[in-house]
Amino acid sequence: MKDPALLEQASELFNGTNINITTEGKRHLGAAIGSKEFHEEYSKEKIDKWCNEIKQLAKFAKTQPQAAYAAFIHGEVHRFSYFLRTIPSMGDLLQPLDEAIENHLLPAIMGTNNITQPERNLYSLPIRLGGLGIPILTDIAEQEFSTSVQITAPLAAIMILQGTNLPDPEEVKKTALEVKKLRDNIEKQKEEIVISTLNQGTAKAVEQAKEKISF
C-alpha cells in the first residue's frame, strides 16, 4: 500500500482472502510501487548502477566514439525514458547521472576535455534539430512522466472500474497527437533558446546539419 495509514482498513476489508497486504514498496515491471521513500531508494540504486555503466561506456568511447554513441542512443536512453515515464518526481535524483554523461561520456565521444553549457544544451536537442539527442534528464523528467500519465489515462480509468474493454483507439490516437504536438512545441522553443547562445559559426553549422537531415 502506498499510504500506511490505510493498512488497518485494508486488512479488515480483505480479511479471509489470500491477498497479501504490505506497506513496503515493490518492484513491478521495472518500476517502483509504494511510498516516496521506496521510490527514492529504488531510484538511487538504479541511478548509481547507471552512472557506473556510463563511466565504463566513456572509457570505450575514447577509442570507439561512434559505437559508444550508438550504444547510448539505442540502448541507455530507452532505459532512462522508461524509468522517467513510470516513476514520478525523479528530477533531483537524476543529477548524478546527468553529471556522469556531461563530465565523462560526452567529452570522450567529442574528443575534448570538457563540455561547455551551450554545447551541452545543443547536444540535448533532437538530431532533426541539429543536436545529438543526448537528453538532460533532470530537464525532461517531469514532462516525460506527465505525458505518460496523459497517454495511459484512458486505460487506467478502465482498470480502476474493472472494465473489460480496451480504450477507444481514436481517443488514444488523439491523445498521442496532442502529446506529440506539445513535445514538438517544447523542443522548438528550446531550440530557439539554444541557438541564441551559440556563436555565429556554430549556429550556422547547426542550420546546415538540419538541412542535410531534412533531405
Where in this protein do the model-derived segments appear?
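Helix-centric, low-specificity signal for extended rod-like, repetitive segments
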Residues: 19-20, 39, 72, 121, ...
